[in-house]
A protein has these predicted regions:
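Conserved functional hotspots at enzyme active or ligand-binding sites that engage polyanionic ligands
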Residues: 1-61, 65-150
Length: 150
């Protein structure tokens, strides 16, 4: 058994370190909601969002569209779960949330939070329906907070 531990140490030293993730340039954001049936920056729409595990699972959830990258939507996920109660745990996991209040995207008008640290790149076909538009001041505050990510 001691040899197995020694072998693991040797192998771990020989492994090449993973290359660092390339930082993407900050996305270009605009505020351009239009009641035209298309997902536009500034709108909260419902879309299928893959889980972070990348195993093919996900769920239909509200997202705030913050821009476009070619024919893909740039969006941030919303939730009605209050992360203020577990803020330390969320921060330790690298997740950052911001309160955005209630809106027409939630039929129960529950207060929502937007996740700032995970920019989603979604196919326009992933959008199921429009929910509502965030007002300009809240949109600008979300974008500023998103850009201040470390």
């Amino acid at each position: 058994m001691p040899e197995r531990g020694r072998l693991r140490r040797i192998v771990s030293r020989l492994r090449a370190p993973r290359p660092p993730k390339r930082a993407r340039a900050a996305p270009r954001t605009t505020y351009a909601p239009q009641a035209d049936g298309q997902a536009d920056p500034g709108e909260v729409v419902w879309a299928w969002v893959p889980y972070e595990e990348g195993d093919g699972r996900g769920k239909d959830r509200p997202v705030l569209v913050v821009g476009r990258e070619g024919d893909r939507l740039l969006a941030l996920a919303l939730t009605s779960k209050d992360h203020d109660r577990d803020a330390a745990q969320e921060a330790a996991a690298g997740r950052r949330w911001m309160d955005v209040g209630a809106g027409g995207w939630d039929r129960e008008r529950r207060p929502s939070e937007v996740r700032l640290d995970r920019l989603l790149r979604l196919d326009s076909a992933a959008v199921r329906r429009e929910g509502a538009a965030l007002d300009r001041s809240r949109f600008d505050a979300v974008v500023a907070a998103m850009r201040s990510q470390p």
